[in-house]
Amino acid sequence: MDKERILTPAVVFSVALLHLAMVALLWQAHKLPVIESGNVIEFVDLGDFGGGDGAPEGAGAPAAPEPQPVPEPPKPVEPPKPVLKPVVTKKADADIQQPKEEPKPEEKPKPEEKPKPEPKPEAKPVPKPAEKPVEKPSEKPAEHPGNASAKADSEQGNGEDKGTGTKGDGTGRGEGSGKGSGGVKGEHGEGAGSSKGNPLRANGSIPRPAYPTLSMENDEQGTVVLSVLVSPGGHVESVKIVKSSGFSRLDNAARKAAQNGHFQANAWTEFKVPVKFELN
């Protein structure tokens, strides 16, 4: 047992030495060789140490230029690779050829229909107010002087002369009555008596009054009786409402029409004019 214990450390030590020797050999074998650079020869000037050339003493020769690095050789330029173009192969035409579809014609947009204008409502005709003929006005003419025989003849020769008056839309016609040199009365007409001299005549008419729009919308109807005072020569001096229709718009329309009336009178004459407003 003791021998075995002594041999064991000796064996371990010897093995370790062998390993170290092998490692040293391998290290020497793989050691890289050192490339020695070329010898540089330096020239030393053995001239006068006093610097005879004017250079300061102790100045040596200029240092040799450092060796320039050797440029690396240029890398070879690779030629460009050729670009392969795709080869298009045409397929053989099939025996059965289908007819090509013809393009469908484009549908033209239909023109837009213009909206039809709405029919305008027809304006209803304005009803025309019916007017009655002008009533017989009262006239007071001045008496004309005459001889006694003329007065007697006039008193004995009183007579009546009747005439017809026409009715029309918007206008009225009438005559006044009065005593003349012949003492003749006229009713709704013109005439002369059997006495001597000329009778006094008075007649006239008014234009058709316009029917007020608001009165038409409110169904206003009625008759207006006017008193028209006319001066000698036929000029309208004043218009008064004797009887109202009940609606101020109708009364004003009748009065305005009477102010524009046409009358014939030889003296101051007052006419009674009825104006009727009626909706059909």
Swiss-Prot record:
The keyword Ribosomal protein does not apply. Residues 90-143 have a biased composition (Basic and acidic residues). GO terms for biological process: protein transport; siderophore transport; transmembrane transport. GO terms for cellular component: outer membrane-bounded periplasmic space; plasma membrane protein complex. Interacts with outer membrane receptor proteins that carry out high-affinity binding and energy dependent uptake into the periplasmic space of specific substrates. It could act to transduce energy from the cytoplasmic membrane to specific energy-requiring processes in the outer membrane, resulting in the release into the periplasm of ligands bound by these outer membrane proteins. Required for heme utilization and virulence. This is Protein TonB. Residues 64-83 have a biased composition (Pro residues). The accessory proteins ExbB and ExbD seem to form a complex with TonB. Residues 196-280 form the TonB C-terminal domain. Residues 28-280 are periplasmic. It holds the Pfam family TonB_C.
